[in-house]
Amino acid sequence: LIQILILMPYVDMSLNSQMIDMVDEYANAYFNDAPIIEVSGRTFPVEVRYLDSVEDRDRGVQQQVVQLVDEIAEEHYGPRGDILVFCPGERQIRDLAKALRGRDRIQVLPLYARLSNAEQNRVFNPSGRGLRVVLATNVAETSLTVPGIRYVIDPGDARISRYSHRSGLQRLPIESISQASANQRKGRCGRVAEGVCFRLYSEEDFLARPEFTDAEILRTHLASVILRMLELGLGDVRKFPFVDPPDAKMVRDGFRLLTELDAVDAHAKLTPIGRAMAKLPVDPKLGRILLDAASRDCLNEGLVIVSALSVQDPRERPPEKRAQSDQQHARFNDSRSDFMAWLNLWRYLEEQRQALTQNQLRKLCEREFLSYLRVREWREVHYQLVVSCRQMNFRVAPMKPDDEQYAAIHRALLTGLLGNVAQQDEGRRFNAARSRKAQVFPASSQYKKPPKWLMAAELVETSQVFARQCAAIEPEWLLETNPLLLKRHHYEPAWSARSGRVMAKERVSLFGLTVSDGQRVHYASIDQKTSREIMIRDGLVSNNFRQAPGFLKHNQTLVSEVMALESRVRRRDRSHPWRRGRRCRSGQRGRGGDRRSRRTRRPCG
């Protein structure tokens, strides 16, 4: 945008943000002190209370929250009002809900991204029955506004998505929030009346925190950004004037993934595959899957799976009905692959969509623990990808039976998920690519009976590294992937009389995982000099051939003829008078009875 304004100063641009401080900073630094217009909604004063007591800090967060809820219900801090409690994740929400349930006139309502629509509607449609306590992740910080909130309880932490270039994992660590996020949370109350924000940390802690949360470009994988910039011809990514420049290691890691996907060459230029990937409105890994699926005549199946991986899981698991929902979803499971479950679910929904009205389909989704809105989003993304593929002249053929297509589908998936392959170590623990350790996610169909080799849609680190969306694969499929990624080590070269060549054992590895070991290969194409020495020593000299080559047969025939000629000459020498062995006058056996010297011959004795 800055470059556009330099080239075209007549262009008007508006920069909008919920945080006026950040707009002020950017306006001063990049936009020549452009005017700032602040539009604020009607708010009431909010009192901030910090946890300054040492005794309070020693207690657990859950115990502090429960006590505060009880005190608010007893009107210790003013009139009763609904409470919004921020929690780092779903597990903390469940634990806190369990601790709060059973209290009179208190309605506990969870709120997080994977919650079913019915449960979310309870939060946004107050029933008027008792004091509402909304337990929410940071989704309620900016994305949603919960009505009627008068009190906010802020423990001061959140689960923040952060990519690690060292481990190659998208991590979800629980971190302390920034001052800006804390103020956003404070702003959730004071909308309908005066509010109170309880911060379960000290004021010194708050002032020591960073002013803003790291920009997303600093904590996410850059492959998609780099691919788009290369397509647009924006020059060297490493020299691009980002507002928040990413770490050079993150840029290198983005190029590494694009190289792995065969999207860029050794000179960091787009390959034909990379240019095709840039035309698809999905993550580069998913785009690579679609390109390979088209070449294997399983594009239709690939479109269903890729579109499913591009949206939030439509399968819902309400905490109080987990067993029932799991039973409903188990109908679509495949013992070999979680990816095939998407195909099974898609076929079922398409059949129902053809037979039912839209309202009936909505009710069916509700009964069978499926989010109707997410199912609809899945279909919309699928349609968008179908249009993109047809514009690229790809043929979208009808689906075939799963048994026929399993290998083709998963080989296509491998091209995009090559960095997420893993080899079984012990039980459910796996050695993943690049020296990582991972465990099969409990919700996977591969959890109870893990395969020897698997690939995962993602490796995510929470309490530990989990492989999510898994499928069994054959190690032989890995040998057909990008040859530049396979490392081959050869050992024990030896002469083979049976094949008439020098053979060696080969060990093939991918990202540190041994794919095959012990297969014998022709060594001459690997080390011609050593092979020649071994062939001469153990083959030619030792005459160790099962079937001698033509030149050797010719040489052996020639040697035999020379030896036969030599033998005949020796026999003639023995028949010569000088070789008859007559005795001389002195009784010694000599040559013709004469003593020979170099130049003369004289009688002995």
Say what each PLM segment does.
Residues 511-515, 524, 528-529, 533, ...:
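Sequence-structural signature of the catalytic-core scaffold of metal-dependent phosphohydrolases
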Residues 69-72, 100, 189, 385, ...:
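Hydrophobic, Leu/Ile/Phe/Ala-enriched alpha-helical segments that form helix-helix packing faces
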Residues 1-289, 393, 397, 424:
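P-loop NTPase motor module signature
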Residues 32, 102, 483, 537-541:
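Short, intrinsically disordered, mixed-charge
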Residues 79, 105, 110, 153, ...:
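Second RecA-like catalytic domain
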